[in-house]
C-alpha cells in the first residue's frame, strides 16, 4: 500500500509555497475548491470578475460592430450625399429613415399619387431586350444625366425652399436650400416638429392651417409669449405638441379653395442679426404658400371623409426690414404709409404708370384706392403686417382716377426711426403687374368725371329712366303687332289741350328735353322727371362750351309713347315759347297722320342731329319747320363741326353683371363699355371702312372725353351720312377695348413697350395702336433703341456678359416702327436674397465680366458716346442684365463689384427717393460689413 500524500494542514512548507504563488489579502475572500487531491485555493474573486468583464466587453464590442455596420448600411440607402451620411449618428439615421419611409407613403398614398413614372420595365420583357433598348435609345444617356440633377436645379432656381409636413406637423422632407435662407441644417430639421422652429405666437395659426387642434391652454400660452420676441419655441414639451383634428366635414375638404394655403409665419434663423427684426429677434418672416394633401379614397361613396395627410409648402423668406435696401426695379413705385395705411409719401414714378400723381394720393388711406372686392384681402395683410412686421399682399386692383384699375402686388415692411423708437411707419413697395384695364369705366363714385352738377344729374337721370322700362330700343324694328296697337291707342286717345296746361312751366324752362318715354303710372319716372326738368336747362350751353368731353356721354334710349305724360315731354322738346305752344296741336295732328316708318325715321334723325339739330327744330314757330326737319336728314350732318357734337342713339340691352338699382353702376359710360366688351355684343363697327389709327386730340369717339360708343346697324343714317357715322365707331384709348391698326393682326394686338399706355398728350387716342405712342406721330419713348443697338447686343453676348432678353424686332431694327411688338417682364416681388457665401465659396462664382457704366460708355465698348446714362440704365434693365439680388452702391463713385453680372449706378439717378438706392446685384462682402457698422 502506497504511502498517502501529506495533507495541506500537515505540510507547512507546501502551504507557504501556495501562499507565495497566490497571495491571500483577506481570508474571507478566499474560495476553497475541493479537488481529488485535497483542498486548495486557486484564484480570487477579483480575478474571476476581470475575466468575466473582459469576455463581456468582447461580446459587446462584436455586437456593436455588427450594429454599426447595419446602421451605416442603412445610412447608405438614404437619399443623401455620402459626405453627410458618414457623419450621422444612430439616432439621426433612424430619424431620417423613418421620415424617408413616411415620405414614400406620403407620395404614393396621397391624392394624386406622385409615382406616375414606372420604376421597372414592363412585364414579360426579357433582360436582353431591356439591354438592347437601352443601347438603341439615343437619348437614354442625356435623360439620365439631365434627370440626375433635375431636382437640384429646380431647387436652386426657386427663390426659397421646399418642405412637406405630415398631419402631426413633422418635417417629412425639407430641401437643403433652407440653410441659405435660415441657416438651419436639413438633417437637423428632417423628422423634427415644425413647432420647435416656429415662433410661439404663430403656433395657433400654424395648427389651424394644418387642420390641427392645440391642447387646452396651448393657445393662451402662445399668445402670452408672442409679445416676448426673445422667447424660444424649442422649450415646449412633447406633451404640448398639437394633435391632429378629426375631419368632421368631408365636404369642406373636397373643394380646391379649402386646400390652398397662403400665410405668414416666423421661423428660427441663425442668419438674422440682433436688432434687425422688430417683432421678434432671431426669427425671419416666411411666406408659406402650399396645398393640403389628402389620402386617396379607395371607396367610391361620398360619405367617406377625406383624411388630411399633410401639407406641401414652398417657403419664401422676406427681406430684412431695413429701409436702405429697397431695390429699384422697372414697373414699381414706393410709398410710405403710417400704421393705419394713411399715405404720407409717394414717388413721382407713379405718374408714369397711372393717371394719378403724388398729390392725388398723399393724405389718403390705401383703402381709398383698392377695389371693393380686394379690401378684405388687404385687411388680412394689414393684420399680418401689424403682428409680424412684414407681409406680401395678394394680387389686388388699384383704382385709377378716370376709371378702371391696375393689378398690383405690394410688399410692406415696418420701419422704426433710429432716433425715436416710438415713430413707426411702413415702407409700401408696389409692383405693377398689368396694363390699365377697363379704362374710362367708372367703378367707384370717386372715378366719376368732374362734370357740372346739373348735367351729371341729367345724364344719370336719363339712364335710370331707361332702366325703368321693360322694353328697349333694340326691339324697335322687330316689335309685334300688339305693341303697335298699344302705341296707336295711346297716341289717338291723348288730348293736347290739357297737356299745354299741365306742362306750361316745364316748357318755359326746358330747352332740351328727354326723348325717352315715361309711364305716368310709374312713381320713379315722375320723380326723375322733376330732376330732369331742373337740370336740362343748361345743356345747350354745356354742349357749346365743352361738348368734346360731354357729347358722347349723353346717351339717349328711345322707346314708344305709352301715355299722355310721355307725349307731353315730346311736345315740350320742340316748343320753346308761348307762341310755339299754339302750334302744338297742329304738330301733333301732322305726327298722327304720318306713318309708323316716318316716326321711326324721326327718332333716328333726332338722335343723330344732337343738340345742334334740336336748336334748329326748336327755332321753328310753325309745324312746317318740324315737317322740314323730318324730310331732310342729310342736311343736319353736312358740317363736320356739327357732326362732332352729335348725340348718339344707341340700342341698350340689359346691362351685364351690373345692378340695375345702383346709380353708380347705371352710369352711361359703364353700361356702354360693358355692353361693347361682352361676348354677346349687339353692336358692331361698319364693315365698309377700316378703323383709322387714333390721331389728334379731338379725333372721333367723343374727343377727350374718353367714352367711345359704337353705333348699331339698325340705327345708322342713310348712305349720305355714313362717313360721319363711321368716324364715331373707332375704338379709342382704352387698352382693353382698343383694336390694332390695319397693318397689325386684329386677333393678336401687339404688346406695348411698357405695361402702361402712353400719355394722352402725345395724341387724342394714345395707345390705340397697342405698342406705339399716342396719336399718329413717331413714338418719343422708342428711343430705348439707341445708336448701334444691335451691335451692342452682339458685343454683350460675345463677351459672356449676359444673355439679353429676347424680343421681336420688326423690319431692320424697328427704329422707325411705332407699333413694334415687344416682350416685357413685369415687376415681381423680390424675396430675401440667399446667402451666397453659404451656398458656394467666393472662388466658385461664375466667371463673367462685370460691366461698369463708365466702361460701357467708353469708345472701346462700341456704343454711342452720346448715349444718356439714364437711357442706358433703363435699357440694361429691359435686357434683364442685372443680377438677381441687391448690391450696395457707393455714392462717391461707381464701384465695380467682385462678383460677375453686377451693374452699379450712382444714387444721383434717383434723387427723388429720401433713402439710398440699391441696384440689382449680388451682395458683396464690404456691403455686409458696412451694414453691420
From Swiss-Prot:
SUPFAM superfamilies: HLH, helix-loop-helix DNA-binding domain, PYP-like sensor domain (PAS domain). Residues 147-217, 319-389 form the PAS domain. Residues 225-251, 505-523, 742-754 have a biased composition (Low complexity). Disulfide bonds: none annotated. Its main location: nucleus. Residues 51-104 form the bHLH domain. Transmembrane segments: none annotated. Pfam families: bHLH_HIF1A (PF23171), PAS (PF00989), PAS_3 (PF08447). Residues 1-11, 676-686 have a biased composition (Polar residues). The keyword Metal-binding does not apply. Residues 695-707, 761-778 have a biased composition (Gly residues). Residues 53-64 are annotated as: DNA-binding. Residues 363-406 form the PAC domain. It comes from the Eukaryota. One of its GO terms (biological process) is positive regulation of DNA-templated transcription. GO terms for molecular function: DNA-binding transcription factor activity, RNA polymerase II-specific; protein heterodimerization activity; RNA polymerase II transcription regulatory region sequence-specific DNA binding. Residues 479-488, 524-544 have a biased composition (Basic and acidic residues). Keywords: Chromosomal rearrangement, DNA-binding, Nucleus, Repeat, Transcription, Transcription regulation. Residues 596-617 have a biased composition (Basic residues). It is found in: Nucleus. Ubiquitously expressed in the adult brain. One of its GO terms (cellular component) is chromatin. It is linked to A chromosomal aberration involving NPAS3 is found in a family with schizophrenia. Translocation t(9;14)(q34;q13). May play a broad role in neurogenesis. May control regulatory pathways relevant to schizophrenia and to psychotic illness. Efficient DNA binding requires dimerization with another bHLH protein. Interacts with ARNT; forms a heterodimer that binds core DNA sequence 5'-[AG]CGTG-3' within the hypoxia response element (HRE) of target gene promoters. This is Neuronal PAS domain-containing protein 3.
